[in-house]
């Protein structure tokens, strides 16, 4: 059985906007990319700019490979709380 999904509020996610803890939202899923910053092919700067917020639009605009999408899954720590999702 799958473990219960961990939900994070937007307020909580927004606190993780620095190099010691870098979280992002993509498609309502929360990613901890702290350890990925230096490995990001697009550079860490773009991730830092989006840190603590929703980067879905930028992620899709840039276009990411299937490999990138598969890799990104390993950094998922939970999901954005349903109450904080756009209606």
UniProtKB/Swiss-Prot annotation:
Residues 5-81 form the Cytochrome b5 heme-binding domain. The keyword Transmembrane applies. Its main location: endoplasmic reticulum. The keyword Ion transport does not apply. It is found in: Endoplasmic reticulum membrane; Microsome membrane. GO terms for cellular component: endoplasmic reticulum membrane. The modification N6-acetyllysine is found at residues 6, 15. PANTHER family: CYTOCHROME B5. Belongs to the cytochrome b5 family. This is Cytochrome b5. The lineage of its organism: Eukaryota, Metazoa, Chordata, Craniata, Vertebrata.
């Amino acid at each position: 059985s799958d473990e219960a999904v961990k939900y994070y509020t937007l307020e909580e996610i927004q606190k993780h906007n620095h190099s010691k803890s870098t979280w992002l939202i993509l498609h309502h899923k929360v990613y901890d990319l702290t350890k990925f910053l230096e490995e990001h092919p697009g550079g860490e700067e773009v991730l830092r700019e989006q840190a603590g917020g929703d980067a879905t639009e930028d992620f899709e605009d840039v276009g990411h490979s299937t490999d990138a999408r598969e890799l990104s899954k390993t950094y998922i720590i939970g999901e954005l709380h349903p109450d904080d999702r756009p209606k």
